[in-house]
Amino acid sequence: MKRRNADCSKLRRPLKRNRITEGIHSSTFLYLKFLVVWALVLLADFVLEFRFEYLWPFWLFIRSVYDSFRYQGLAFSVFFVCVAFTSDIICLLFIPKQWLFFAASTYVWVQYVWHTERGVCLPTVSLWILFVYIEAAIRFKDLKHFHVDLCRPFAAHCIGYPVVTLGFGFKSYVSYKMRLRKQKEVQKENEFYMQLLQQALPPEQQMLQRQERETEEATSKGMSEADSVLVAQNGTAINKKLPISLPELEYKEKGKDSAKDKKQQQHSIGINNNILQTVDAKLQDIEYMENHLNAKRLNNELGGSAENLFLKEEVGAGGGSAPSKHYKNSSPRSHNSTNGSVPSSSSNRSDKKQKCTGKNLAPHRDLMENCIPNNQLSKPDALVRLEQDIKKLKADLQASRQVEQDLRSQISSLSSAERSMRSELGQLRQENELLQNKLHNAVQAKQKDKQTIVQLEKRLKAEQEARAAVEKQLAEEKKRKKMEEATAARAVALAAASRGECTDSLKSRIRELESECKKLTHDMKLKEEQIRELELKAQELHKYKENEKDTEVLMSALSAMQDKTQHLENSLSAETRIKLDLFSALGDAKRQLEIAQGQILQKEQEIKELKQKIAEVMAVMPSITYSAETNNMTPVTPHYSSKFMDTSPSSLDPNASVYQPLKK
């Protein structure tokens, strides 16, 4: 039995293991596995002439598409596929094939080693250098045609898919930074508005909130310090136990975070509502709030003095535990009673006073007698102020209504002016279109006239040249004719003198010359007619030139009309701007009217409440009795409005990160 127990204890004792040797063995085995996988893939590539390492990014792409379809929907998955496809096509078209294969293979192997648990260390860097050297020295030059054509799309995908993932990662990083920036801005705004709200609270509530915060911070610090001490003392044992309790802790932390988020949302909504109300209200609202706060302070002071009297009496009568109870009863919540609870509260206090001794009754009576007149004096002042505020608001309302009527009349006049201007603008546009059509026709006619003028000028020049040539020929013919006539006369004279044999030949010659002269005269007449026609055409051309001057006048008139239309358009745009400004002013006036009406209703309600309270106080005044036998006073406590005292502790969180409004 002893031996058996000894053996069991020996077996139960944990064996010490050297972690350094385990790390070395595991790392060497891992890198040997990488080398074996790499060698097998290279062998398969060499034997089958296909690069199987390109299928790994394709498999990753299919997994990412499936995950996007499962978690983000069909639209995002289709968009992701389209983006990856376009990036693959760009890499396929614009990257040379050798560099494409080199970059794809090196990226695949480097990424495969990068995904290990070791990270960047000496073995991984050495493997990367080996892969890059083999790819650059051996495989960069050995490319076959069938191998290239089949594997090129997969190589393009090996580069295009990482580019797409990097782009999405960069986009998510930028959106995360922008979200953090927005959260910081919203946190600053929330802190600012939280400080405003804390400053607006009464000092008692501020002190209570500070104490609550200090206690919460102390508890949180104590919990964190206790956790750190436990971790430091226990070491690995606690670390081993932590994963077991992590789900419960996460569940509790999630519940706390959700509750805090809800509270922060409610506080942020309340803060924003208060902010909108304070921004929309103007100087009159500020004055009203000051008066309201002054009245509240007066009521608090009066109520505090009366309660302090009762507390002092009860402290004098009771023991050390009584003040705390009465202090709790004298909290502002005790004053939030209705009219039906007045007799019960007065009877309770009278019973307590009957139990107490008769010490210090005279000063208490004096103080209570001074309390009610002060309250009576403060409330009519508030009524007077409220009536003055109502008168001011009514005057402002009438002024805003008059302004609204003036604005509406101006809007109607401007709308009528706009209609007339639009009609005039339409007429001017029609006239402008007609003038543009006339101008277009005139320009076309002018171009045609210019073409005809150029042709006629060419004809005129040709005719003038022909006329000059004909005139030269006529002059030469006349000279020749004169010479011939002279020679003929001489010859005739000589022939007549010598012999009369050449008369027939001379007669025939004379006939020929006469016929030629007739032809020349006929040609001269034709040329003169042509010259007259050309002169008529030249006159027509002069008329066309005069018409060009008329077209220039029309152009100047058209430009003037265009300037006028542009001026009218500018004036119309200015009037539309004025109308928009007037509409915005009308909207502001309506908002001010609504705000003023709401304030008037609120103040009327407050006046009614104050009148009711004054009537109640006046009715309660004769109820104060003095008994000579018991020397006890049974006053009725003054009524204070529970509306002006909100003692609910604020649980706003100034460290709110993001404002999230409620969705309706």
Swiss-Prot record:
One of the record's GO molecular function terms: microtubule binding
Key word Translocase present: no
Region Disordered: start-end pairs: 206-225, 315-364, 644-664
Membrane topology listed for this record: Multi-pass membrane protein
GO BP term, example: neuronal signal transduction
Residue positions the entry lists as glycosylated: N234, N336, N339, N348, N655
Biased segments, Low complexity type: 334-348
Record field: transmembrane: 28-48, 75-95, 120-140, 154-174
Superkingdom of source: Eukaryota
Chief subcellular location: nucleus
Biased composition regions of type Basic and acidic residues, renumbered to the chain: 210-219
GO CC list: nuclear membrane; rough endoplasmic reticulum membrane
Location of the protein in the cell: Nucleus membrane; Rough endoplasmic reticulum membrane
Keywords, in A-Z order: Endoplasmic reticulum, Glycoprotein, Membrane, Nucleus, Transmembrane, Transmembrane helix
A Pfam short name: Macoilin
Compositionally skewed regions (Polar residues) per UniProt: 644-658
Family that this chain belongs to: Belongs to the macoilin family.
Function: May play a role in the regulation of neuronal activity.
Protein name stated in the entry: Macoilin-1
Organism: Danio rerio
Lineage: Eukaryota, Metazoa, Chordata, Craniata, Vertebrata
